[in-house]
């Protein structure tokens, strides 16, 4: 039914309509697109939390993956007046992870930064390796007061009170956490005042699972 709604709204948008009717169709387009995205996120969240997603672990170069996702989001970061600062560890630090799922984790975190980071500030993306553990860290200053504990931010549908007018389902961090843990990794958030930090860690050799 949702696909039919989206398709019919798309057909309406191509008709010659009075100005007031066209504005209504534009609202329908935006809201149906948001509903479609929410439905997709719900399906993904359900699959991730139940482990109903195939996982293929292999040595994954975090530096390459992090550089690629930063490149993908360069224009969007510029549009939000955010300055990316990329800091990579020594070459050769590979995580045992599923590259496809890890990309989805990083994509969710980047999307979160674009929505909630304060314009005109720097956002930090770092990779590090120590003690057989490889880690990716995202840091940004929030444009909204972080009035909620870090652990609650990872609950489904939870967003800060003042951010509810922004785009998004409130599922991004929950999905990122589930997908990370599905690969045997660790996902945690840290909040210090308005500083928001997301930390994703994986074993370098793949011999053990991590726990937050």
Q: How should these model regions be labeled?
A:
Residues 113-114:
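Short helix-loop "hinge" at the ATP-lid/N-box region of the Bergerat-fold HATPase_c
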Residues 184-185:
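Conserved glycine-rich
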Residues 145-158:
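Short conserved segment of the HATPase_c
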Residues 56-74:
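A conserved beta-strand-to-alpha-helix junction within the catalytic ATP-binding
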Residues 30-35:
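Short alpha-helical segment of the dimerization/phosphotransfer core of two-component systems
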Residues 56-59, 78, 83-93:
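Conserved catalytic submotifs in the C-terminal HATPase_c
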Residues 50-55, 94-97:
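Conserved micro-motifs of the catalytic ATP-binding
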């Amino acid at each position: 039914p949702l696909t039919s709604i989206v398709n019919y709204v798309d057909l309406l948008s191509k008709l010659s309509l009075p100005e007031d009717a066209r504005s209504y169709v534009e609202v329908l387009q935006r809201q149906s697109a948001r509903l479609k995205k929410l439905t997709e996120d719900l399906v993904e969240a359900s699959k991730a939390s139940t482990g109903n997603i195939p996982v293929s672990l292999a040595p994954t170069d975090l530096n390459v993956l992090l550089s690629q996702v930063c490149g993908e989001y360069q224009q969007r970061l510029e549009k939000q007046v955010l300055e990316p600062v990329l800091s990579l560890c020594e070459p050769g630090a590979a995580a045992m992870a599923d590259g496809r799922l890890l990309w989805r984790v990083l994509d969710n975190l980047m999307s979160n930064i674009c929505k909630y980071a304060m314009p005109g500030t720097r956002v930090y993306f770092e990779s590090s390796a120590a003690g057989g553990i490889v880690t990716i860290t995202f840091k940004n200053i929030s444009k909204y007061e972080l009035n909620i504990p870090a652990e609650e931010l990872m609950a489904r549908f939870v967003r800060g009170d003042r951010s509810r007018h922004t785009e998004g389902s409130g599922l991004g961090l929950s999905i990122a956490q589930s997908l990370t843990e599905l690969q045997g990794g660790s996902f945690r958030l840290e909040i210090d005042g308005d500083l928001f930090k997301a930390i994703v860690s994986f074993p370098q050799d793949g011999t053990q699972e991590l726990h937050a």
